[in-house]
Design a protein with these regions (language model features):
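Short coil/turn linking the two alpha-helices of tandem helical-hairpin repeats
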Residues: 60-67, 113, 139-142
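Residue signature of alpha-solenoid helical repeat architecture, marking inter-repeat boundaries
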Residues: 43, 50, 93, 117-120, ...
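Inward-facing hydrophobic residues that define packing positions of alpha-helical scaffold repeats
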Residues: 17-20, 24, 95, 102, ...
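Amphipathic alpha-helical segments of tetratricopeptide repeats
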Residues: 106-107, 114, 154-156
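Short coil/linker segments at helix-helix boundaries
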Residues: 36-39, 62-92, 96
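Hydrophobic-face positions in mid-chain alpha helices that act as interaction patches
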Residues: 141, 145-177
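Conserved, well-structured interaction surfaces
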Residues: 1-63, 89, 107-110
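Residue-level signature for tetratricopeptide repeat
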Residues: 55, 134-136
Length: 177
């Protein structure tokens, strides 16, 4: 492809993983500020776990051998170590890491729920993480987990179903031509 972004998908996703790792591996206890700052940092660490989980999931779907009959997953760097020439993990290990990251994301973000700002489009909300995790579990055919996560989102009452007559107009930007 002549599209450099499409051609460099592997590299671009691993850049996200590297940046997420910097946050995930940050020692929150080294912060000098009050407990509120540590709680906010915990929330952002949760967001980083979510980004890493989604990145690993995208890499597994694009470059893992799950759907071609192989057993190779992807490379799972969870700490920065430029000298480590890490090989591919198995599909099972890759999926275990994705699930652990989604779980850590939800746990950390829910423990600092006061920092959840679903109206801020530059941040990942708790419900957005649950939706991403539900999508992952849908790929794994784990419908009980999907239902549990989706029920949590619905129970939050932050969203409503759009009436069928308003569906098309709901995609139109207000004030656009």
């Amino acid at each position: 492809s002549a599209d450099s972004y499409a051609a460099n998908t592997y590299k671009q996703i691993y850049k996200v993983v590297a940046k997420a790792n910097n946050i995930v591996n940050f020692d929150i206890n080294s912060l000098d500020n009050a407990a509120a700052s540590k709680a906010e940092a915990t929330y952002y660490v949760g967001q980083a776990y979510a980004l890493r989980a989604q990145s690993f999931f995208d890499l597994l779907r694009l470059y893992g051998q799950k759907y071609t009959g192989g057993n190779d997953g992807i490379v799972l760097p969870v700490k920065f170590d430029p000298l480590n020439k890490q090989g591919r993990s198995s599909i099972a290990d890759t999926e275990k890491q994705i699930e652990a990251d989604f779980e850590a994301a939800i746990n950390k973000m829910e423990s600092s729920k006061s920092f959840d700002r679903p109206d801020k489009r530059s941040e990942i909300s708790i419900n957005a993480v649950k939706a991403l995790a539900a999508r992952y579990y849908l790929y794994k055919n784990n419908y009980a987990k999907v239902q549990s996560l989706v029920n949590d989102i619905v129970a939050s009452k932050k969203y409503k179903v759009i009436e069928k007559d308003a569906l098309v107009s709901s995609w139109e930007a207000s004030g656009s031509a």
